[in-house]
Amino acid sequence: MPGERPTDATVIPSAKRERKAITLDLKLEVLRRFEAGEKLSQIAKALDLAISTVATIRDSKEKIKASSQIATPLRASRLTRHRSAVMESMEQLLSLWLEDQSQPNATLSAAIVQEKAEFDDLQREHGEGSQTERFHASQGWLVRFKECHCLPHFKMNSAAPSNKDMYTEMLKSIIEEGEYTPQVSLT
């Protein structure tokens, strides 16, 4: 048939480019170069970005500059999908809280961070439109949050820290109730 490809021809599938997260720092560099008067194609070539990407960064200049005022590190990559204002606010507050908790040798349990991430009070603050959004601070969310906000240095225990303490307290109560002496309880 005239419209079909020959069967002996090898078909090379087009390679889909991997999505590249652009850091806020790089976006600010693009904007700085625009303000200095560089052309769009020159910026794209110098920073190894697509021209359409550089144009999109130029068009969303106000949003990028507003994001740079927030306390997240400049090397943090911006999320590529749209997040609600309540979710962004919660993640910013949680990031600040984690930075405050950054004492040497301090480990946080994942359960504490996930509990802190619940944003019911923020939803009430933002009104009824945000009440419909559901959020569960899952383990996967926590991993992505740490990666997005450049927080890999925080050590988080996934196990509850109370198991060891609970066993110690139970043992003490058994010893006291049975009126055992320390020598008898160790044998």
UniProtKB/Swiss-Prot annotation:
Gene3D superfamilies: Homeodomain-like (1.10.10.60), Winged helix-like DNA-binding domain superfamily/Winged helix DNA-binding domain (1.10.10.10). Residues 78-155 form the HTH CENPB-type domain. Keywords: DNA-binding, Nucleus. Residues 40-60, 111-148 bind DNA. One of its GO terms (molecular function) is DNA binding. SUPFAM superfamilies: Homeodomain-like. It holds the Pfam family HTH_Tnp_Tc5. GO terms for cellular component: nucleus. Residues 13-64 form the HTH psq-type domain. It comes from Homo sapiens (Human). It is found in: Nucleus. Disulfide bonds: none annotated. This is Putative CENPB DNA-binding domain-containing protein 1. InterPro entries: Homeodomain-like_sf (IPR009057), HTH_CenpB_DNA-bd_dom (IPR006600), HTH_Psq (IPR007889), WH-like_DNA-bd_sf (IPR036388). Signal peptide: none annotated.
